[in-house]
């Protein structure tokens, strides 16, 4: 899909859609349904506002990625949307607003709020929701209505996290950020028979790293909260970047903008060349003597073993 992105001339942004923490219990009890609702609300918001001539008046393309965690592995479901900086108008001509993002931050959050809560209410009315743990009280009509009222009063957050310049920066972002899990090994600092200590970002202190220690069972509980439902698709493509449109319409966009098609630096490379290019590790060089390694295959009289490298 990323080979369909245009070159360095196009501005690409990461728009983040979040929900208030009051919804966390009911979302966690209905992960598949209410994660899908996040995608529905985010995509409907972007499509509707982008097509409005007051903002852009064009069909846009974007990628949606679900994240469910905060730095401390707390439950924080939100959607990242990587949005092209323009789109095709009704005459199939490219239209953008220069370097400025075409949708107002405050208004987009209000539209997203309305669409998400509308789908949530519809699911409740159709008795499609389950209620577990602290969400059990929302089976009651009055409690659920009170929850909706609280969420409508709140200012939801839909902010622009990062601006990309061209396809390569998007690829770097996707590779390093969107495909990660709730925590990586290097953040786990120490453990005992009873506790685990790991690094978290303190956003109240300018994003400084600090260490947090929790019981082992609590660490496992936090990690398992972020295992997605079976066969759940976390990365989804829409508009100009959808599978149906990406080949023809993105080629048309490149022609209109005079951009070169992105060609991966890894194309037609061998596995050893890819490792060298990505990690600067030469697997064909002996780590002990520095000599060049060659493949060594055993002869027919030697017990069958895998081929290995020798210098």
Would you name each region that the model predicts?
Residues 1-12:
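Single conserved hydrophobic/aromatic residue that forms the stacking wall/gate
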Residues 25, 34-64, 71-200, 204-242, ...:
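Conserved His + Asp/Glu catalytic blocks
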Residues 258-276:
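Short Cys/His-rich Zn2+-coordinating modules
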Residues 8-9, 300-311:
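Short cysteine/histidine-rich metal-coordination sites, predominantly Zn2+-binding motifs
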Residues 294-299:
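Short Cys/His-rich "knuckle" micro-motifs
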Residues 283:
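Residues immediately within or flanking Cys/His clusters that coordinate Zn2+
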Residues 287-288:
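Short, cysteine/histidine-rich loop/knuckle motifs that typically chelate Zn2+
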């Amino acid at each position: 899909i990323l080979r369909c992105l245009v070159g360095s001339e196009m501005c690409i942004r990461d728009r983040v859609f979040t929900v208030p923490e009051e919804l966390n219990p009911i979302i966690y009890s209905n992960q598949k349904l209410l994660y899908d609702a996040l995608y529905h609300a985010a995509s409907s918001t972007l499509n509707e506002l982008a097509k409005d001539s007051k903002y852009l008046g064009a069909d846009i393309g974007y990628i949606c990625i679900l994240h469910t965690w905060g730095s401390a592995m707390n439950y924080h479901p939100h959607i990242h949307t990587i949005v092209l900086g323009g789109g095709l108008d009704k005459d199939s001509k490219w239209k953008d607003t220069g370097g400025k993002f075409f949708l107002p931050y405050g208004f987009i959050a209000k539209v997203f709020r309305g669409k998400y809560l509308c789908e949530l209410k519809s699911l409740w009315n159709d008795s499609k929701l389950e209620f577990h743990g602290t969400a059990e009280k929302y089976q009651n009509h009055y409690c659920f209505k009170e929850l909706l009222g609280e969420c409508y009063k709140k200012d939801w957050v839909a902010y622009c996290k990062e601006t990309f310049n061209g396809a390569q920066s998007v690829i770097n972002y996707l590779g390093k950020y969107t495909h990660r899990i709730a925590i990586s090994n290097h953040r786990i600092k120490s453990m005992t028979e009873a506790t685990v200590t790991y690094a978290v970002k303190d956003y109240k202190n300018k994003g400084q790293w600090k260490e947090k220690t929790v019981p082992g069972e609590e660490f496992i509980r936090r990690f398992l909260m972020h295992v997605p439902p079976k066969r759940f698709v976390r990365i989804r493509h829409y508009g100009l970047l959808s599978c149906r449109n990406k080949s023809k319409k993105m080629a048309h966009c490149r022609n209109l903008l005079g951009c070169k098609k992105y060609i991966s630096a890894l194309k037609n490379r061998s596995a050893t060349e890819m490792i060298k290019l990505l990690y600067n590790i030469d697997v064909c060089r002996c780590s002990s003597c520095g000599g060049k390694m060659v493949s060594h295959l055993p002869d027919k009289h030697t017990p069958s073993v895998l081929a290995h490298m020798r210098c």
